Each structure stands twice: as C-alpha cells, then as structure tokens.
Amino acid sequence: MQLNSTEISDLIKQRIQQFDVVSEARNEGTIVAVSDGIIRINGLADVMQGEMIELPGGCFAIALNLERDSVGAVVMGPYANLAEGDKVRTTGRILEVPVGRGLLGRVVNTLGEPIDGKGPIDNDGFSPVEVIAPGVIERKSVSQPIQTGYKAVDAMIPIGRGQRELIIGDRQTGKTAMAIDAIINQKESGIKCVYVAIGQKASTIANVVRKLEEHGALANTIVVVASASEAAALQYLAPYSGCSMGEYFRDRGEDSLIVYDDLSKQAVAYRQISLLLKRPPGREAYPGDVFYLHSRLLERASRVNVNYVEKFTKGAVTGQTGSLTALPIIETQAGDVSAFVPTNVISITDGQIFLETDLFNSGLRPAVNPGISVSRVGGAAQTKIIKKLSGGIRTALAQYRELAAFSQFASDLDDATRAQLEHGERVTELMKQKQYAPMSVAAQSVSIFAAEKGYLKGVALNEIGRFEASLLSYMNSQHTDLMNTINATGDYNADIEGELKAGMDKFIETQTW
C-alpha cells in the first residue's frame, strides 16, 4: 500500500487532533536531606521564593533558600515520614489562607483549618499570606478612637483606628490581659477582632478562648493558634495568616483589630528556621532580616481611604474608610527594652504601653508606666470628653512619682507639695482596674472628672475603689440620659459639665460609699 505525501500529512494532523493528554506544568525534585523540619531538595529549577512545594502524603513545604544547586525549604507540619530520595514537586502557588465572615467565632490553625471541632468553615475565598502593605497615597490619617476600656490607656495613651500600639513588658505583667480586655470591649462597637497566639501553651490559649466566650466577644473574633508544640514554620507564619484575615474587613470598609501574642516568640521561631537553613547569624544570633520580618507585618496595619475601599470592592462599598489596628505584644527579659527585638518593634510601631513588674507587684494593675509609655498618633483620635478631662492626669502622675522619690529624703514638706502628693496618690489609686471589666467612655469620664475636679480629696485611699463603684452606680441610675449621651457622642460642653458637676455634688451629699 502506497501513501502519497498529502495523505500522510492529513493522517498526522488527524492523529494530533485525536491526541488527548492532561498537560500539567510539573517541576519535580528529590529530597537529599531532612533535619529538624528543614528539607534540602535537588532538581527544582523553576521554584520561586516562598512557593509551596508538595511533599509525599499531602503535606507542604515553603521554599525559603534558593541556592545554586539546591533549595532549602521549611516543612509546614510533621516531617517524621519524609526520607531522603522522596520525590517532591512545585505547585506554582504561594501560601493562601481562607478569609471571610465565616471565620468569626472560630479557632483555626496557621493554615486557616478549624481546630475547635465545630465543623468546616464557610469562607468567602482565599487571600495570600504575604501581601504588600497599602502605599502612602492609599492611607488616611488616624482620627477615630478605639476604646480599650482601660482608664489608664484611653486617658493617657489613646489608640486610634489604624494605629500600631506595642504592649511591652516582662512575663506575668498583664500584657495578654490588656489585649483580651481590649477585644472584649469591642463586642458592641462592631469592630472585628483577630487574636493570634504564637508559641503559647495550648492550655493558656484554651483559657483565653473560654474567657472570650464567657464575655460574649468570641462571636466577633477569629482566634489563630500556633502553639508551642507546633512546627517553627507555623509559628513564624501565624501572624501573617491572622493579618490576612483582618485585612479582609479593612479592605471592605470596616474596622478590625488584631493582637499578636507575642512577636518575641515569632522572632525566636524565625531565628531557629534561619539558623537551620545556614543563614549567617547577627546580633543575638538573629538573622539580618529580623527587622523586615516585623516591619512588613506591622506596616499592613493601617487606615485606608475611601478610594482604596471603592477600588478594592469595585464600587460595591462607597464613602467608607477601612482600618486594621495592631496591638503587637513583646516580652522583655528583666525589663530590658534596649534588647534587639524590643528596640526594633518600638521603632516600627506608633507608640508603646510599657507594663512594669514592680508596679504590678505593688498592686497597681494595669501596671502601666506613664513615664515611658506613649502614643504618637492616638491623640488626634481621642474622644473629645476624655481629651478635655484627662489633660492633668499624666502630669499629676509624673509629678507624683518625682515628688514621691524626693519626699523619701525630705522630712519637712510644704502644703503645696503635700497636696500634690495626695492628689497623685488618689489618681494612682483611681487608675487601678479589675481584669475583664472594661469601662465605657461615660464611666471613664465620670471617674476622671471626679479626680480632676477635686471630688476625691475627702475620700480615704483605701475607699477610692468603693467610692468609684458607688459613684458610677449612682450616675447610671440617676443620670441615665447623660451617660447615654456621652457614650453616643463623646462630646464635652458647658451643659454636660454642669450636669456632671450637679450629679457629683448630689452624690457627695449622700455619703453612700
């Protein structure tokens, strides 16, 4: 049988058309070393920095070191079943986590998988873990307050929506308690919260989740967990996962709050990974890019303008700004704020709340040191009534500390100095507050008004707590409209001042504390 060239050509074309194969861009490699959660792979020619690599058994690794003849990757989970010679392949994807309202009220791991036993999550999509922070033009200045519910913080170190405020202190000084109370205080405000637990004991995290549930704040909160028993890679990535979940609300014109508890442990996890990858160590054995580790995370917390939200939602949301407020926590060793990681994070954030062991042990809780605590941008966002009333609080406390130190050596004090000392003592006592009892704007205003206008003068130091509780109970029952007005508007004018004064005078007459 003879075929001419035309028939051969037609036959080849026909065969090509009939040929069916699932074409898949694959780039396979071989594991050449496995140790401490780090794998070294040969043969991956086209792998990207940060790309997910599929391992045997459905597990994944992330490519972090791209070298001339091999790739260093960190395993996202258990690595006991991996062995030299196993085949791996690239995926062409970077790590993404589920985002959306379906995550509210849930406890998830770094990868966004539920670990609370409440079934699958109904997410609205996925978002990359690493996202470039909004640019300068896309931002709006901080001008709205976020109430923590703590008098000491809202009066002296106010926090605005879109701000980064560091909570720093030694272990067991109330850092987590302050952050949890700030989350509990948002349950009526509409602000969505994310709590990221890094390198903590599972029992501690379970206690935090239980407290949030007891106080009705869990329904408004996403809890991201990378406990101490989990791989260093998951502890390193957990803050970025939580940030992506918080950004979902920011980008849609809503306000969100994220707590990183704590970034010291994330830095330690990253140091562990870097040393295992044979990266050159620097100060305190941290790698050279540990500053960038935190700066690229915290710069994502911002207040974005109307145009950004409109562009992101393709016109679905108009006239709304969005914000992501960050409360990173750093644990210091013996009060050393000049160590490497604390100084890095202090320089990145917009202020810090310094909690001191000595103050905590002396019974002053929250143990805020007003001398070195500062909020660099929150003043513009402070509620009007708190701003007007709290001007003298910080000054009174600063003068009191100075005079208290001086009075130890001076036997005879003049009347003015003694009056300043007594006022400072009373303000210090008034700043004390119980855990899980955040205060409304109106309640804070009443307490600060009492201190500023001299209503505490005749009250014994050990009765100030009882005096405050009775005063607030009286104002809530007898001046409900005033309290509701202050909570709703935050305004301060002659009428409000007059009504507050009249209420205080009547309460003092009753002597019911």
UniProtKB/Swiss-Prot annotation:
One of its GO terms (cellular component) is proton-transporting ATP synthase complex. Its EC number is 7.1.2.2. GO terms for molecular function: ADP binding; ATP binding; proton-transporting ATP synthase activity, rotational mechanism. Gene3D superfamilies: 2.40.30.20, ATP synthase alpha/beta chain, C-terminal domain (1.20.150.20), P-loop containing nucleotide triphosphate hydrolases (3.40.50.300). InterPro entries: ATP_synth_asu-like_sf, ATP_synth_asu_C, ATP_synth_asu_C_sf, ATP_synth_F1_a_nt-bd_dom, ATP_synth_F1_asu, ATPase_a/bsu_AS, ATPase_F1/V1/A1_a/bsu_N, ATPase_F1/V1/A1_a/bsu_N_sf. It holds the Pfam family ATP-synt_ab_N. It catalyses: ATP + H2O + 4 H(+)(in) = ADP + phosphate + 5 H(+)(out). Keywords: ATP synthesis, ATP-binding, Cell inner membrane, Cell membrane, CF(1), Hydrogen ion transport, Ion transport, Membrane, Nucleotide-binding, Translocase, Transport. It is a peripheral membrane protein. It is found in: Cell inner membrane. It is an enzyme of class 7 (translocase). The keyword Membrane applies. The record marks 373 as: Required for activity. It comes from the Bacteria. ATP binds at residues 169-176. Produces ATP from ADP in the presence of a proton gradient across the membrane. The alpha chain is a regulatory subunit. F-type ATPases have 2 components, CF(1) - the catalytic core - and CF(0) - the membrane proton channel. CF(1) has five subunits: alpha(3), beta(3), gamma(1), delta(1), epsilon(1). CF(0) has three main subunits: a(1), b(2) and c(9-12). The alpha and beta chains form an alternating ring which encloses part of the gamma chain. CF(1) is attached to CF(0) by a central stalk formed by the gamma and epsilon chains, while a peripheral stalk is formed by the delta and b chains. Belongs to the ATPase alpha/beta chains family. NCBIfam families: atpA (TIGR00962), PRK13343.1 (NF009884). This is ATP synthase subunit alpha 2. It comes from Shewanella frigidimarina (strain NCIMB 400). The lineage of its organism: Bacteria, Pseudomonadati, Pseudomonadota, Gammaproteobacteria, Alteromonadales.
